[in-house]
Regions:
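Active-site or metal-binding loop neighborhoods of secreted/extracellular toxin and effector enzymes
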Residues: 106-138
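Secreted/periplasmic proteins that engage bacterial cell-wall peptidoglycan
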Residues: 1-100, 113-120
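Glycine-rich catalytic cores of cysteine/serine-nucleophile enzymes that process amide/ester linkages
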Residues: 103
């Protein structure tokens, strides 16, 4: 199996977030799965080709406590037309194509209160175009 690598869409989004929030907390950031992820299906686990299709951002993006919700919500709305995005989880809610990108209660093990989880589709493996999100433009 090839070495794990974050999909191009994930790399681009991470770079955009880092530029928009250079002093943000990164303690809950991550992309490649740890041992708890490897025991179950997770987009943090590499595909057979080595692609990791998930990235987490610490919820403390800035001094504004609403910034993480605004970011997650803008991603959710963008995902209606950007097929690289698979789903978003934050603060006990999940949005995906299956629910027409409406927030619903997330019932998984981790409510994602300390970080925003974004999963990507296969289209994101090599498509690293920038994401058109107002919060990332300053």
């Amino acid at each position: 199996m090839p070495n794990p690598r974050l999909c191009a869409a994930g790399v681009t989004l991470r770079d955009q977030v880092d530029r928009a929030f250079p002093n943000r907390d990164r303690r809950s950031d991550g992309w490649v799965g740890d041992s708890s992820h490897s025991a179950r299906k997770s987009d943090h686990n590499p595909t057979a080709e080595g692609w990791v299709r998930a990235v987490d951002f610490d919820a403390n993006l800035s001094d504004d406590p609403k910034a993480s919700y605004v970011f997650a919500n803008q991603l959710r709305l963008l995902a209606r037309r950007d097929r690289r995005l698979s789903y978003c989880i934050y603060s006990g809610k999940i949005a995906s194509r299956r629910t027409l990108w409406r927030w619903r209660k997330y019932t998984g093990v981790n409510p994602h209160n300390t970080h925003i989880h974004i999963s990507f589709t296969k289209k994101g493996d090599k498509d690293g175009r920038p994401f058109d999100l107002a919060i990332l433009k300053g």
